[in-house]
C-alpha cells in the first residue's frame, strides 16, 4: 500500500511515476519545439532590423565602451598593495569580489545583490563605517599602483610620476 503523502490527487499512482508518465515527455517535447537553436540568434538580429514592405532594413549598430573603474588597496592579511579594474556596472549594481594576488583572500568590494549583507553595501561605506580613509581623487594615485594597461592613460596624474606630470592639469581642472 502506498502512503497517502506520496499520492497525487487521491489516486494510487506515486508522484514519481505520475510525472514520468504524463509530464516529462510533454515538457521535453515542448522545450525542444519552442526553443530551436537558431531562434536565439534570430531574436538578437531582430532588434537591429525593421521589416518594411516585407524587406528587412538595417537600422545600424554602434559599439559602446563599458565604463571601467580601478581600485588600489592594501590587503590587511598579507600587507600586499595591489590594483585591479572592474566594470562600473558591476560595482554599482552587482557583487564584486577581488582576490589578493599574494594570499588569495577574497575582498568584498560591492554587494548590491545582497549575497553577503542584508542591504546594499560598497567598500566605501564599509571603510567609512570603520573610520578608514577613502579617496576617489585621481591625484592620490601612486604610479606603482596603476596597472600596466592603464599607465598610459592614468600615469600622468600619479603623484610620483616624472617631472612632466606636474605640469599637466588635473582631470578636474579644464
UniProtKB/Swiss-Prot annotation:
<keyword id="KW-0496">Mitochondrion</keyword>
<feature type="binding site">
    <location>
        <position position="75"/>
    </location>
    <ligand>
        <name>Zn(2+)</name>
    </ligand>
</feature>
<keyword id="KW-0813">Transport</keyword>
<keyword id="KW-0862">Zinc</keyword>
<dbReference type="GO" id="GO:0005759">
    <property type="term" value="C:mitochondrial matrix"/>
</dbReference>
<dbReference type="GO" id="GO:0006457">
    <property type="term" value="P:protein folding"/>
</dbReference>
<dbReference type="InterPro" id="IPR024158">
    <property type="entry name" value="Mt_import_TIM15"/>
</dbReference>
<dbReference type="GO" id="GO:0050821">
    <property type="term" value="P:protein stabilization"/>
</dbReference>
<keyword id="KW-0479">Metal-binding</keyword>
<keyword id="KW-0472">Membrane</keyword>
<feature type="zinc finger region" description="DNL-type">
    <location>
        <begin position="64"/>
        <end position="159"/>
    </location>
</feature>
<dbReference type="Pfam" id="PF05180">
    <property type="entry name" value="zf-DNL"/>
</dbReference>
<dbReference type="InterPro" id="IPR007853">
    <property type="entry name" value="Znf_DNL-typ"/>
</dbReference>
<comment type="subunit">
    <text>Interacts with SSC1; binds to the nucleotide-free state as well as to the ADP- or ATP-bound state of SSC1.</text>
</comment>
<feature type="transit peptide" description="Mitochondrion">
    <location>
        <begin position="1"/>
        <end position="47"/>
    </location>
</feature>
<feature type="binding site">
    <location>
        <position position="78"/>
    </location>
    <ligand>
        <name>Zn(2+)</name>
    </ligand>
</feature>
<keyword id="KW-0809">Transit peptide</keyword>
<dbReference type="GO" id="GO:0006986">
    <property type="term" value="P:response to unfolded protein"/>
</dbReference>
<dbReference type="GO" id="GO:0008270">
    <property type="term" value="F:zinc ion binding"/>
</dbReference>
<feature type="binding site">
    <location>
        <position position="103"/>
    </location>
    <ligand>
        <name>Zn(2+)</name>
    </ligand>
</feature>
<feature type="binding site">
    <location>
        <position position="100"/>
    </location>
    <ligand>
        <name>Zn(2+)</name>
    </ligand>
</feature>
<dbReference type="GO" id="GO:0030150">
    <property type="term" value="P:protein import into mitochondrial matrix"/>
</dbReference>
<protein>
    <recommendedName>
        <fullName>Mitochondrial protein import protein ZIM17</fullName>
    </recommendedName>
</protein>
<keyword id="KW-0999">Mitochondrion inner membrane</keyword>
<dbReference type="GO" id="GO:0051087">
    <property type="term" value="F:protein-folding chaperone binding"/>
</dbReference>
<keyword id="KW-0143">Chaperone</keyword>
<comment type="function">
    <text>Involved in protein import into mitochondria. Acts as a Hsp70-specific chaperone that prevents self-aggregation of the matrix Hsp70 chaperones SSC1 (mtHSP70) and SSQ1, thereby maintaining their function in mitochondrial protein import and Fe/S protein biosynthesis. May act together with PAM18 as co-chaperone to facilitate recognition and folding of imported proteins by SSC1 in the mitochondrial matrix.</text>
</comment>
<keyword id="KW-0653">Protein transport</keyword>
<dbReference type="GO" id="GO:0007005">
    <property type="term" value="P:mitochondrion organization"/>
</dbReference>
<dbReference type="GO" id="GO:0005743">
    <property type="term" value="C:mitochondrial inner membrane"/>
</dbReference>
<dbReference type="GO" id="GO:0005739">
    <property type="term" value="C:mitochondrion"/>
</dbReference>
<keyword id="KW-0863">Zinc-finger</keyword>
Amino acid at each position: 500500500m502506498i502512503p497517502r503523502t506520496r499520492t497525487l490527487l487521491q489516486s494510487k499512482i506515486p508522484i514519481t511515476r505520475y510525472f514520468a508518465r504524463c509530464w516529462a515527455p510533454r515538457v521535453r517535447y515542448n522545450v525542444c519545439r519552442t526553443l530551436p537553436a537558431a531562434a536565439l540568434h534570430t531574436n538578437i538580429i531582430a532588434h537591429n532590423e525593421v521589416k518594411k514592405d516585407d524587406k528587412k532594413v538595417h537600422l545600424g549598430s554602434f559599439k559602446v565602451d563599458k565604463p571601467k573603474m580601478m581600485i588600489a588597496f592594501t590587503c590587511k592579511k598579507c600587507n600586499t598593495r595591489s590594483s585591479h579594474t572592474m566594470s562600473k556596472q558591476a560595482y554599482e549594481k552587482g557583487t564584486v569580489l577581488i582576490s589578493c594576488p599574494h594570499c588569495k583572500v577574497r575582498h568584498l568590494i560591492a554587494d548590491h545583490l545582497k549575497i553577503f549583507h542584508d542591504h546594499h553595501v560598497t567598500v566605501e561605506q564599509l571603510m567609512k563605517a570603520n573610520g578608514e580613509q577613502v579617496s576617489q581623487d585621481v591625484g592620490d594615485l601612486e604610479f606603482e599602483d596603476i596597472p600596466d594597461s592603464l599607465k598610459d592613460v592614468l600615469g600622468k596624474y600619479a603623484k610620483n610620476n616624472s617631472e612632466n606630470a606636474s605640469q599637466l592639469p588635473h582631470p578636474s581642472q579644464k
